[in-house]
Amino acid sequence: MEHNASDAVGTRDAGWQTDMCHRTSGTAEQGGSKNKGRGGRREQSHIRAYSSASADGYRMHRNHTGGAESPGAEQGTPPRRNSVLKRRSLIQTIMSPEGGAASPERGRRSVSLYSPASAGSDEGDVGAMLQTLATRELALLEQRKTVEDLRRALRLEERVLVAQARELEELKQRVARALDAGSPRAVLEPGAELPGAPGARESVWAKSMSFLNEFDQILQEGLEKRLGFDELMPSPATDATTPEADDRRGIWGLVSEFKAGLLGLSDSTPPPDAPAAYLEKQRNRSVGPEPRRTNTGDAVAEHSRDARYARKRDLHEQAYSPADAAAENGVVTGGRLGATPHSSGSIRKRCPPLSTSVEMQNYV
């Protein structure tokens, strides 16, 4: 009976302790209503763990005492008060010293690190961190790949640019060579020489021009000798009568005659039966500044033309009689000298017959 009574009392005390735990958990839930979520669930699990621990401790105490009643029971006092005090002392560890509910921070610190809830939360945090790390590593790899692609494209562009610059330089050289070949009068720079050339070579045009100048000079000298200019103006070069000079005169005689015929200078040669006075007068009138030597025969032709006109005028004057004053003061009418009171006839009647003269033929 005693054991049955004690078991009944223990069962009743366990029920009361369970009610107290539920009340305490309700109070804790009301006090921590603001902290919802994972913190509130941890507090509830903490309170339940301690309530189950207190119930297990009471059962262990009953088994250790062998089901004996407390001293208060032997004295006739109800054992309920003593058991209530013991259970209250076990529950005070959950409550705050002031009698209020335990704070969320203390509950979190008292929870074991090896509890299933904390382990699950830690595993979730680590998984999220690993996922974030993997995402960032993938983004970093993509950025590195993009940078490598850009560098490769830059190298390709640089190679293309170098090739285009080389082609442009070659095109410029081709254009320069084409222009040089198209313009034969292009003069090279003094310092510019073709690679592989043995030395400075004269141009074909320069040789041709020098040859023509020399030939023209020789012809001019021959003409001057034929016209007698070197006799009027002696010089050391013309005074020296050497066999070479004679040979040159003989060689270039035909050439000078041919050129004189082309220029129309054959008319200026006096007839073989010309008097000495005519030649002397011609020499006196031809004395003057030496014609300028040029590469062409224009100056020589002009000088010879003036000399021919002067000789024609001399021949015309020579045809008059010095004693006839009327002929000098006559008036030209119709291309002839008219008769004057002191004249004894026409000029044509007193002129010597010069029909065989070339000068007279040109004059008429």
UniProtKB/Swiss-Prot annotation:
It is found in: Cytoplasm. It holds the Pfam family TDA11. It comes from the Eukaryota. Keywords: Coiled coil, Cytoplasm. Its main location: cytoplasm. Residues 1-81, 94-121, 263-305, 324-352 are annotated as: Disordered. Signal peptide: none annotated. InterPro entries: Tda11. Residues 139-181 form a coiled coil. Residues 24-33 have a biased composition (Polar residues). One of its GO terms (cellular component) is cytoplasm. Residues 290-305 have a biased composition (Basic and acidic residues). Belongs to the TDA11 family. This is Topoisomerase I damage affected protein 11. It comes from Eremothecium gossypii (strain ATCC 10895 / CBS 109.51 / FGSC 9923 / NRRL Y-1056) (Yeast). The lineage of its organism: Eukaryota, Fungi, Dikarya, Ascomycota, Saccharomycotina.
